[in-house]
């Protein structure tokens, strides 16, 4: 029989051919700026667990916050028939996301009106962080934010954080960071900012 021959020959099915026939790969791509960053590392962990539970595999892409790399990954996803994209980066023009013939969900940033976006509970996060600072009796806090637009709600986290500290008598210096920094550069830059602002 066919099944007996399969066992005897130790036949391994060609999954790519199967996927082409079914028009389904059971792969979901997660595109992030830097998976070594603690935030993205934890997000990736839980997305992978949830996908696996539903018989999907995760295809992880790191862009390094570069436009060309994000574009290359998205092109590769289209060519390799992933079933969808979870987008944690947003370096490209709105039209490039709109023209994707794939299901796409954006994370914490509205890339286009018609693309669904999942947002963090930023107000709650800002309050939790501020309460932890207050509980530990910190005297001087540097609240570093990136330049944000109306497409990103993360500014709400920083706003609630800063307001809560100031209401509770904690010195909070709000600093807007105008350039993108890679994860490995953050600690060095933070030390410089602390020396400049919190030692006075």
Residue spans of the language-model regions?
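N-terminal helix-turn-helix DNA-binding module of bacterial transcription factors
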Residues: 1-24
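N-terminal winged-helix
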Residues: 32-52
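Short beta-strand elements in bilobed, periplasmic/extracellular small-molecule ligand-binding domains
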Residues: 51-62, 142, 158, 162-187
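Hydrophobic alpha-helical segments within soluble ligand-binding/sensing domains
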Residues: 118-143, 156-159, 184-194
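Central regulatory/effector-binding core of bacterial HTH transcription factors
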Residues: 49-94
């Amino acid at each position: 029989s066919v099944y007996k021959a399969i066992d005897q020959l130790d036949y391994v099915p060609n999954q790519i051919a199967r996927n082409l026939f079914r028009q389904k790969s059971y792969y979901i791509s997660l595109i992030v700026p830097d998976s070594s960053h603690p935030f993205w590392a934890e997000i990736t962990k839980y997305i992978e667990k949830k996908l696996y539970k539903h018989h999907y595999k995760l295809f992880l892409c790191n862009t390094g916050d570069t436009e060309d790399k994000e574009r290359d990954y998205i092109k590769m996803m289209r060519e390799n028939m992933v079933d969808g994209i979870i987008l944690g980066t947003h370096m490209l023009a709105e039209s490039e996301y709109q023209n994707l013939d794939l299901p796409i969900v954006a994370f914490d940033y509205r890339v286009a009106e018609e693309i669904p976006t999942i947002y963090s509970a930023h107000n709650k996060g800002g309050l939790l962080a501020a309460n932890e600072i207050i509980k530990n009796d910190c005297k001087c806090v540097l609240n570093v934010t990136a330049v944000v637009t109306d497409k990103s709600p993360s500014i709400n986290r920083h706003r609630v954080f800063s307001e809560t500290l100031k209401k509770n008598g904690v010195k909070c210096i709000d600093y807007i960071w105008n350039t993108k920094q890679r994860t490995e550069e953050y600690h060095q830059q933070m030390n410089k900012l602390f020396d400049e602002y919190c030692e006075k």
